[in-house]
Amino acid sequence: MFNKSYLKKNLTYFLEIYKNRPIKNNKSGMKIDHCFALYCLLKKIKPKYIIESGVWKGQTTWLLKKVLKNSKVFSIDIDFSNREVIYDDVKYLNKDITQYNWNKLDKNKTLIVFDDHVCFSKRLNFLKKNKFKHIIFDDNLPNHHIGYYTPKMIYERQYLIKKEFIKYSNIYRSFKFIIRYFNNEFANNVKFNFNFKFIKITYSIKVNKNLKKNFDTFRNKIKIYYEFPPIIKFNYKKRFEKVLTNFNESISHSYNVKKPIFNMNEIKLSEELTKELNAQYSNICYINLN
């Protein structure tokens, strides 16, 4: 969708906007890599309507309004308690995206931005029924790195292997695990690894005919599947530092990421922005459906 020269040129324009972002520390929200991806995709697609599923503090809403001032934005979240940025002309909705009637929107001119941490397999029937064409998915991680299905997994024909980590220091979760364990609530093929600081649970693959059918149908409708590249070379250790440090996970050598936009010696950013690079990159993607 984009060549490198276009992306390099547009990063300069983006940074002029991004330096004035309202939330400097957007922990758990979009940072520089994904905000730049969203910026470029918005300028490319130019939707008339934008449905933002997952608001958090409102940084993404701010970027949507900044890039496309005349687009109608619907911002959805079941919990607005963390919101810091609010607009009078944005329609805020507090139920799941599936609970609203979107029939009046021109689907060819409507973009959905999914950043709600909901399994993408649960969105397929909704997308099919409503005939949405343009989708951006934020947390598009591959297998072994997230606890639910993402477009990347479905596109690459991966079936979810779910992992769960429970620290003994988390009394509530540890107690809940003990109850589940002694009530035989885990399937026989679930694997347990009892570390001295935590428990690692690896669940078996669950595939049924309906799930496979939905995945096949979705793949057949894809016209474009595009993963936006990281700004600089992907740093696996930096991105997954918490899991690697706290749960002794090994580095995955099968984690495929697109080639970066810049070499390290080609770009100079402030210390603040440099810290954001790779800190949240999750293979953000754009999907265009038939």
Each language-model region and where it sits:
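A short alpha-helical cap/connector motif
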Residues: 1-111, 118-290
